């Protein structure tokens, strides 16, 4: 592999990552908020996928959120310690972030005190998508070109 091409691709992706991080900060105030949100979303990815696909109107955030929430078993959720382990964020910060998301109904606690998705989970979904779209589009383009070059070698 040509070292110059690798470095050029790496630096180009790093530049896009900086832009993506700025966009994430605009939407979520900081990366920790975003990581906690992603951690809970990743835990519920099956229910989110099924809920979005099963929703009669994907553009209706409330209807889609209800479709997702209906698919989450009552006993399923993530503990604060699980989020701390997954994200590497200090427990006090995770607790503060979760409390803020609980007030906004982005998250809710189930009967066992586990964190799960709330009715307003999709409230800033469009901003998240806009903030991430350019970054993932650029990374895909750059890594495809790099992968093609590697396969030719």
Which residues make up each language-model segment?
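Charged/polar positions within long, soluble alpha-helices
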Residues: 22, 99, 103-106, 141-148
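A short alpha-helical element within helix-turn-helix/winged-helix DNA-binding domains
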Residues: 69-70, 75-85, 101
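Short helix->loop/beta-hairpin flanking segments within DNA-binding domains
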Residues: 35-76
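Amphipathic alpha-helical interface surfaces
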Residues: 32, 76-79, 93-97
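Short, cationic-aromatic polyanion-contact patches
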Residues: 61-66, 79, 106, 111-136
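Amphipathic alpha-helical dimerization/coiled-coil segments
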Residues: 131-153
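N-terminal leader segment of winged-helix/HTH proteins
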Residues: 1-38, 42
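Short amphipathic alpha-helical interaction segments
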Residues: 88-103
